[in-house]
Amino acid sequence: MNYWLIKSEPESYSLEDFRKQKIATWDGVRNYTARNNLRAMQLNDICIFYRSVHKPAAIALCRVVREHFQDPTTDNPAWLSVELELTEIFKNEIYLTEIKAHPELQNMALLKLSRLSVQPVTPEAFEIICNWANS
């Protein structure tokens, strides 16, 4: 199993939107590295749902329920989507400022590649964030 972090701007797709839909098509990704990460996602991989821009924070978990397919928002077959199911809303949001301050999270792609919308997360970082979010 692999772990990922997916970013969303609340104006585009909020946690409330995800909660209502339960299963989301993750589309509109137009960065090659992020697209390659979508391609690498496997069934049942787990993603941290991260709210970007306003009060950026890790706020929920979701899992991959459909592996990559052509993004339905474009005719260009180079761009991909996956389907994600919301599985858990964190008890405590983990804000970017807290992640930046945590010594064991300093190597997260979130801090090094801040604009990347789909990024891998190590099992260690995933465990730290989930334990923290649910404590």
Mark where each language-model region is:
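Short, charged beta-turn/beta-strand-edge "cap" motif at the junction between a beta-strand
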Residues: 50-56
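Aromatic- and Lys/Arg-enriched surface recognition patch
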Residues: 59-119
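Short glycine/proline-enriched turns and hinge-like loops at secondary-structure junctions
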Residues: 17, 41-42, 57, 75-77
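Short, charged, solvent-exposed linker or helix-capping segments at domain edges/interfaces
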Residues: 17, 93-99, 130-132
